[in-house]
Amino acid sequence: TRCSRDWSSDVCSSDLLKAAPPPPQQPSSPVYIPFAFTGIKGTPDDFHLPTANSAIIALIEAVVSKEGPISIGLLSRRVAEHWGVSRVTSRALNRVDGLLRRANVKITADDGKVFIWPPSQVPKEYTDFRVPGQDELSKRDAEDLCPIEVANGALYLLEQHVSLPVADLVRETARLFGYARLGQNVDKAMKSGIEVLMWSGRAKEDGGVVVVR
């Protein structure tokens, strides 16, 4: 399959992108609901101690169960904040990364970006996508969107229009996920998802227009 395990890429980014107000919700467009902060469990120094391993693993599983598929960068932020870590550095990211193998989760990667899934989900059979709600934390950075999820959102739009020029599909998919403008990261994330959609055989490009197969 396209997704494969790849631990060589640092997908954590501080390049925050402002999201637009969400589009009107559709029954097939569930809102992305973030994991609720459960309280401080220790200090930033405690986060890196072996004694915190069990608590970190439990939080990994809880966050992934709520938000998966979730990028390793966003997962690390959700987990690390319980130890007062306000900014996820490569050290904190590696801390979570190092415990993933011990957690009951699935791990995939696309173009070097690692995403974590609940054990009950089958990535290649995943057909859902989630849009931002009113909670600020439900508005994900573009690099935290799983390409498979973006592909599903793009397909949802194509099924309404039958076909769209590539540029229009990129723009409308970005809008669906709450982005008012196409910055570099947003554009890249949308195009990556559309590429996954076409690779999956559910759509094709013909003369600059993407058509549902």
Where are these regions (language model features)?
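Charged low-complexity interaction tracts in eukaryotic proteins
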Residues: 27-51, 90-145, 188-213
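Acidic, proline-/serine-/threonine-rich low-complexity intrinsically disordered repeat tracts
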Residues: 16-29
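Single conserved hydrophobic/aromatic residue that forms the stacking wall/gate
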Residues: 1-15
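Terminal recognition/anchoring or ligand-binding modules at protein termini
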Residues: 178-182, 197-198
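Positively charged, polyanion-binding regions of nucleic-acid-associated proteins
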Residues: 42, 50-71, 139-165, 176-177, ...
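A short acidic, leucine-rich amphipathic alpha-helix
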Residues: 75-79, 169-173
